Curated annotation (Swiss-Prot):
Active site: K268, R342
Gene Ontology MF term list: manganese ion binding; metalloaminopeptidase activity
Binding, Mn(2+) 2: K256, D261, D279, E340
Provenance organism: Phytoplasma australiense
Cofactor(s) of this protein: Mn(2+)
Catalytic activity: Release of an N-terminal amino acid, Xaa-|-Yaa-, in which Xaa is preferably Leu, but may be other amino acids including Pro although not Arg or Lys, and Yaa may be Pro. Amino acid amides and methyl esters are also readily hydrolyzed, but rates on arylamides are exceedingly low; Release of an N-terminal amino acid, preferentially leucine, but not glutamic or aspartic acids
Entry protein name: Probable cytosol aminopeptidase
GO biological process, one term: proteolysis
Record-level GO cellular component terms: cytoplasm
C-alpha cells in the first residue's frame, strides 16, 4: 500500500474511489462537491437517513463518466466528541470498503471541526493497522492490498508527509508484534525468536544474547527450570536503543517469552491449548516497541529484556514441589508448573534491575487467566509501586485506546506468596486474587527502590481483542501504549 499527501484534489489524479468524512448533522462535507457535482450523495443521505453518526457509512456507485466510480462517506459523530481516536477507528472502518479499489482519494479535512495533522495521521494509522492480515500459510492467495494507492487531501499535506515516517515506525512495531504472536510454535521457537530480535540491528538496536551456559553462571535457575522439559534452549535477550544523552539512565521494558506453554507437568486442558503459541506476547510487544522507537529514532535510551523458554512436559521437566534458587538468591517453591511466566520474569527482572540499572522498569506478560475473569478483553491489568508511573500509563492507555486498569498491591497480598518450604510460592492456593498475587510475586524481585509496573495482557494480546482497526488474532496491544508513554514522558527529558 502506498500513501501520499496532497494539498489539493485534481481530476487528473484519476482515482476510482473517494472517501469523504461527515460530521454529524453538519450540512457539508469537504471534497464532496469535487467528486459529486450533481449532488447525488445528499439525496442518498436523505433516503438512507444518514446523518454522520459515528460508525455509520454510505457507499455510492457512480456511472461511467463520473469523477469517481465509488464514493464512501464515513460518519465521524458529534462535533464535540470527535478526537484522534475517532479518526483512528474511522480509518480502520474504512479499509474493508476499499478492497476492490486501486487508487483512492481521502478528503481528510472534515468540515465542522478544527483540523489537525494528528487526525490525519490517526486516520492513516487506523487504515494501515486494519490492512494487516496473517495469511502466510494459506495456499490460495487473495488480491494483494499492497497495490492500493491512497492520497490524502489536506491543508496540512506538507507536515503530514513529514510526520508519516513516525506512523510507519509505529505501524512496523505493531505489525512485528502481531507477526511474532501469530506464528505457530513449530516455526517460531526460541532460536527463531532470537533471530527475529537480531534483525533489529539493522535499525541500530544493539542485541546481546545470553545462552544457557551464561544463564547458569548467573544463577538464573527460576528461568532455567521452566525450560528443562523442552529440547529448545532458553535465552535472555537484551536489546538496547541508545538515542538519548550518553549519561542518561535508560527506561526498561521486560517481556515474558514462553514460545509455547503446555503447562508442563501441570498440563493444561487440550481445549484451546493451541492458543498457547501466543504466551510470548509480552516479549513480542517489547520487540515491537524496540522496533518502533528505533525506526522513528526516538531521542531516549531504552532497554528491552526478554526471557525466552518453552514449557513442555518430559522426563527432565520441572515437577510440582521442586524448589529452585533464583538469581536474586530467593528460593521458590514450584507449586504449579503452569505458573511459569512469573518464574521467567523473576530472573529477567532481577537481571534488568541489578545488572542494567535502569531508572524505571515495566514488564509485560500474558500472566494470568484471572485477569481475564476480572477485566475481560478490553483492559489490561496494571500493577505498580509508583503512583506517577500509574498516572502516565493510564493516560497513555486512554489516548491510544490500549487501556489499562490498576489493581491493588500491599502487605496483605504479599504475605500470600510466602512459601511453605521455600521463601516464595509460585502459586498460592485457595486465596483468590490470582492476578494480584502473581504481581506480588514479581514485586519480590523489584522492590520499592525503582519505579516499576507490571502489565498483565492475557486478555488483550490475542483472540478476543478485535476492534475497528484490528481484525487479526494477535492484537499487537502495548506497542502504541508504550510508544506514547516514552514519547510523552521520557523522551527529551
Amino acid at each position: 500500500m502506498k500513501i501520499y499527501f496532497k494539498k489539493n484534489y485534481l481530476p487528473s489524479m484519476d482515482v476510482d474511489t473517494a472517501v469523504v468524512l461527515q460530521v454529524e448533522k453538519y450540512e457539508n462535507s469537504f471534497g464532496l462537491e469535487a467528486v459529486d457535482p450533481k449532488g447525488v450523495a445528499k439525496k442518498s443521505f436523505l433516503r438512507e437517513n444518514f446523518k454522520g453518526v459515528f460508525g455509520t457509512q454510505v457507499k455510492l456507485l457512480y456511472p461511467e463518466g463520473s469523477p469517481v466510480a465509488c464514493l464512501q462517506v464515513m460518519g465521524l459523530g458529534k462535533q464535540e466528541e470527535i478526537n484522534d481516536q475517532t479518526f483512528l477507528k474511522t480509518g480502520g472502518l474504512c479499509f474493508p470498503q476499499l478492497n476492490k479499489a486501486n487508487k483512492v482519494v481521502v478528503f481528510a479535512d472534515a468540515l465542522g471541526i478544527e483540523n489537525q495533522t494528528s487526525q490525519v495521521m490517526h486516520f492513516a494509522l487506523g487504515l494501515l493497522l486494519r490492512s494487516y492480515s496473517f495469511k502466510h500459510y494459506h495456499t490460495q492467495k487473495t488480491k494483494n492490498e499492497k497495490n492500493l494507492e491512497i492520497t490524502f487531501i489536506t491543508e496540512n499535506a506538507e507536515l503530514c508527509q513529514k510526520e508519516f515516517d513516525d506512523v510507519k515506525a509505529i505501524l512496523g512495531g505493531v505489525n512485528l508484534t502481531k507477526e511474532l504472536v501469530n506464528e505457530p510454535a513449530n516455526i517460531l521457537g526460541t532460536n527463531e525468536f532470537v533471530e527475529r530480535t537480531q534483525q533489529l540491528q539493522t535499525l541500530g538496536v544493539e542485541v546481546e544474547v545470553l545462552n544457557k551456559e551464561t544463564l547458569e553462571k548467573l544463577g538464573m535457575n527460576a528461568l532455567l527450570g521452566v525450560a528443562q522439559g523442552s529440547q529448545r534452549p532458553p535465552y535472555l535477550v537484551v536489546m538496547k536503543w541508545l538515542g538519548g544523552n550518553e549519561n542518561e539512565k535508560p527506561v526498561a521494558f521486560v517481556g515474558k517469552g514462553v514460545v509455547f506453554d503446555t503447562g508442563g507437568i501441570s498440563l493444561k486442558p487440550s481445549n484451546k491449548m493451541e492458543d498457547m503459541k501466543g504466551d510470548m506476547a509480552g516479549a513480542a510487544t517489547v520487540v515491537g516497541l524496540m522496533h518502533a522507537l528505533a525506526a522513528r529514532k526516538a531521542k531516549v535510551n531504552v532497554l528491552g529484556v526478554i526471557g525466552l523458554v518453552e514449557n513442555m512436559p518430559g522426563s527432565n521437566a520441572q515437577r510440582p514441589g521442586d524448589i529452585v534458587t533464583s538469581m536474586s538468591g530467593q528460593t521458590i517453591e514450584v507449586i504449579n508448573t503452569d505458573a511459569e511466566g512469573r518464574l521467567v520474569l523473576a530472573d529477567a527482572l532481577w537481571y534488568c534491575k541489578t545488572k542494567l540499572q535502569p531508572k524505571m522498569i515495566i514488564d509485560l506478560a500474558t500472566l494470568t487467566g484471572a485477569i481475564v475473569v476480572a477485566l475481560g478483553y478490553e483492559y489490561a491489568g496494571l500493577f505498580s509501586n509508583n503512583k506517577e508511573l500509574v498516572k502516565q500509563l493510564v493516560h497513555s492507555g486512554e489516548v491510544t485506546e490500549e487501556k489499562v486498569w490498576q489493581f491493588p498491591l500491599g502487605p496483605e497480598y504479599d504475605r500470600l506468596v510466602d512459601g511453605k518450604f521455600a521463601d516464595i510460592s509460585n502459586c498460592p492456593v485457595g486465596y483468590g486474587a490470582g492476578s494480584i498475587t502473581a504481581a506480588q510475586f514479581l514485586k519480590r524481585f523489584v522492590g520499592d527502590d525503582i519505579p516499576w509496573a507490571h502489565i498483565d495482557i492475557a486478555g488483550v494480546a490475542s483472540g478476543k481483542k478485535k476492534n475497528e482497526f484490528n481484525s487479526s488474532w494477535a492484537s499487537g496491544f502495548g506497542v502504541r501504549l508504550l510508544n506514547h508513554l516514552v514519547k510523552d514522558y521520557y523522551e527529551n527529558k
